[in-house]
A protein has these predicted regions:
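Conserved metal-binding segment of the jelly-roll/cupin
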Residues: 54, 83-105, 112-115
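A short, N-terminal "cap"/entry segment at the start of jelly-roll beta-barrel domains
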Residues: 1-44, 126-144
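Residues that flank catalytic or metal-binding motifs in active/ligand-binding sites
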Residues: 31, 47, 68, 105
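Conserved short histidine dyad/triad with adjacent acidic residue
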Residues: 33-38, 45-63, 82, 93-97
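Double-stranded beta-helix
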Residues: 99, 103-144
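Glycine- and acidic-residue-biased ligand/ion/polar-headgroup-sensing regions
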Residues: 55, 64-79
Length: 144
């Protein structure tokens, strides 16, 4: 049983995916609906939502100091040297290197990115998931 007083507990929050628009993600052919994301008043809230991949979309090798879990809902993805399909869950502990990803089929994934328990690194929302325009891939910061 928790020793936290009942009035200190936070209420459940629920968001339907249809309540959010698809937003421009930093990598070519990728779009996101982050249903939850860190905000000034809730800095430890995870990035959690959907990422849609167009056929042929990809991203390069890069690294993060936060942790994340992906669940493949649709499509096939080449991630590093392996191919994964629907029903596969992937876990990236913190810190981690994220290998190149590509998809010929396109697809859909559930993403949950959260503060790394080892590094304390927090997921980044602004300027990555809610972009008005993409930069060329070679101008993206692959160090975060």
């Amino acid at each position: 049983m928790s020793s936290t007083p009942v009035d200190a507990h936070q209420p459940l929050q629920a968001v339907h995916a249809d309540a959010r628009p698809w937003e421009t993600l930093r990598w070519p052919g990728q779009w996101s609906k982050m249903l939850f994301h860190p905000r000034p008043e809730r800095p430890t809230e995870p990035n959690a939502g959907l990422v849609r991949y167009e056929p042929g979309s990809h991203h390069p090798f890069h690294k993060h100091d936060f942790a994340q879990v992906w669940y493949i809902l649709e499509g096939e993805f080449r991630i590093g040297e392996a191919t994964y399909g629907p029903g596969t869950m992937l876990f990236y502990p913190d810190p981690h290197f994220e290998p190149p990803l590509s998809t010929a089929t396109g697809g859909l994934m559930l993403f949950v990115q959260y503060q790394g328990p080892d590094t304390g690194g927090r997921p980044i929302y602004d300027g990555r998931f809610n972009m008005t325009a993409r930069k060329p891939v070679e101008q993206e910061n692959v160090e975060r």
